[in-house]
Amino acid sequence: MPYIEGFVAAVPTANKEAYRKHAQEAGAYFKKLGATRLVECWGDDVPKGALTDFYKATQSKDDETPVFSWVEYPDKATRDAVNKKMSEDTSMANMEMPFDGKRMFWGGFEQIVNE
């Protein structure tokens, strides 16, 4: 069953187009290494919660929009191999990110329902 690596970040709203281009480049890179697809979603209807929400989780500023994305892999072993290749590839360190990557969070997820 496919394995998912999900990401949440806060992106300056003014950088939407730069982020879209960055995501396209990253998606091509992930796919070259073994991912099957990348999905990037720009926050459109994201409510603020009393206890927690996308804004609090990323320490968003007033001029930032939450982004939710995921990379799909054929399996966890492929995801692990891709992450290893990425950690060894110095070209990724030079990729300019149009957001504060320190406030991004991510994790790997095993699918339990896929309909």
Task: Enumerate the predicted regions with their spans.
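N-terminal first-folded block
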Residues: 3-40
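Short, well-ordered beta-strand segments in beta-rich or mixed alpha/beta enzyme
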Residues: 4-11, 50-86
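Residue-level signal for secondary-structure boundary sites
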Residues: 17, 77-79, 114
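Generic preference for well-ordered secondary structure
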Residues: 3, 14, 22, 63-66, ...
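Glycine-rich beta-strand-turn "strand-cap" elements at beta-sheet edges
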Residues: 31, 35-62, 91-115
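Bulky hydrophobic/aromatic packing residues
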Residues: 24, 42-44, 70-73
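Short amphipathic alpha-helices in soluble, non-transmembrane regions
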Residues: 20-26, 82-89
